From Swiss-Prot:
Protein's name according to its UniProt entry: Retinol dehydrogenase 10
Residues that, per the record, bind NADP(+): 40-64
Organism for this UniProt entry: Xenopus tropicalis
Keywords, alphabetical: Endoplasmic reticulum, Lipid metabolism, Membrane, Microsome, NADP, Oxidoreductase, Signal-anchor, Transmembrane, Transmembrane helix
GO cellular-component term (any): endoplasmic reticulum membrane
Protein's gene: rdh10
Locations listed in the record: Microsome membrane; Endoplasmic reticulum membrane
Annotated binding of substrate, by residue: S197
Reactions the enzyme catalyzes: all-trans-retinol + NADP(+) = all-trans-retinal + NADPH + H(+)
Membrane topology: Single-pass membrane protein
PANTHER family, sorted: PKSB, RETINOL DEHYDROGENASE 10
């Protein structure tokens, strides 16, 4: 009898979860404040990582930027400093206009910290994380964004590039989380954001290593979320970001069927980041952009494999990566010819 009562209770909780989800969809929750919080972003030197840094800077977060390219990372940091200066000027103007203390949020003591780190190397992650703890303090929000793509068919891809893709795109999430999660758990306070991809939910031909790495991120993130729930660490939030193809140049040349592309074009980076920020700041567990990706993922789970293949071929998604791979191969050959290899 006890298990029967528990079954009805669980059923009620499941239905209530649907009600809450619908309510959040109809009435967007208020964004939480990250002002003064230490937010660490990997792969901050370019692309989505840079845009995430600028968005968090506008919200007065204290930023720690990691990238393997120190020059591009410093360029991002300078953009962040420019935003901080604008916020300081706005605060000064408000004070001059006799604004109340609540209306003026301090920003003048904020700094942005840059670290050159190869997240694909465990030792580099752990040593850099130790420097961050010593020089900056405890990290509140960890945004795992760094990623690479090899751009080769499986049988043509050097083993070293496959390993590199897995290390940077997937294994790095393990190292950074192990470095900063203990303090979050001690305080029951923090937020871990995993930037994966729609190719971590469904796959296509020609990017086996990339898909495997992103599927790994999705599995890692979901298991971590369950582990935090099992440990009753409700103060630590997690957000999984799964965007469709983003127009950052990472997959330049990738094309679906030309008749379909106007209805499903590559995402603008700014739009992708703004949607992700909405999810992060409202503690949303997962965000797929565009929303159509939710439907595609569901259909892939319930349809027969041959039906999925038919859909891929209709959309031109079965070989959408082939032009991208051809461009990468041509660029590699041109570089080798230029260098006399």
């Amino acid at each position: 009898m006890h298990i029967v009562l528990e079954f009805f209770l669980v059923t009620f909780k499941v239905l209530w979860a649907f009600v809450l989800a619908a309510a959040k969809w109809l009435v967007r929750p208020k964004d939480k404040s990250v002002a003064g919080q230490v937010c660490l972003i990997t792969g901050a030197g370019s692309g989505l990582g840079r845009l995430f840094a600028l968005e968090f800077a506008r919200r007065r977060a204290q930023l720690v930027l990691w990238d393997i390219n120190s020059q591009s990372n410093e360029e991002t940091a300078e953009m962040v400093r420019s935003i901080y200066r604008e916020l300081e000027a706005e605060d000064s103007a408000r004070r001059a206009g006799n604004a109340t203390e609540e209306e003026v949020q301090p920003c003048c003591n904020f700094q942005v910290y840059t670290y050159t780190c190869d997240v694909g190397k465990r030792e580099s992650v752990y040593s850099t994380a130790e420097r961050v703890r010593r020089e900056v303090g405890d990290v509140y929000l960890l945004l795992n964004n760094a990623g690479v793509v090899s751009g080769h068919h499986l049988l043509e891809c050097p083993d070293e590039l496959i390993e590199r893709t897995m290390m940077v795109n997937c294994h790095a999430h393990f190292w950074t989380t192990k470095a900063f999660l203990p303090k979050m758990m001690e305080m029951n306070h923090g937020h871990i954001v995993s930037v994966a991809s729609s190719l971590g939910l469904f796959s296509t031909a020609g990017v086996e290593d990339y898909c495997a790495s992103k599927f790994g991120v999705v599995g890692f993130h979901e298991s971590l979320s369950h582990e935090l729930k099992a440990a009753d660490k409700d103060g630590i939030k997690t957000t999984l970001v799964c965007p469709y193809l983003v127009d950052t140049g990472m997959f330049r040349g990738c094309r679906i069927r030309k008749e379909i592309e106007p209805f499903l074009p590559p995402l603008k980076p700014d739009y992708c980041v703004k949607q992700a920020m909405r999810a992060i700041l409202t503690d949303q567990p997962m965000i797929c952009t565009p929303r159509l990706m939710y439907i595609v993922t569901c259909m892939k789970s319930i349809l027969p494999f041959e039906a999925v293949v038919c859909m891929y071929r209709f959309l031109g998604a079965d070989k959408c990566m082939y032009p991208f791979i051809a461009q990468r191969k041509q660029a590699t050959n041109n570089n080798e010819a230029k260098n006399g290899i």
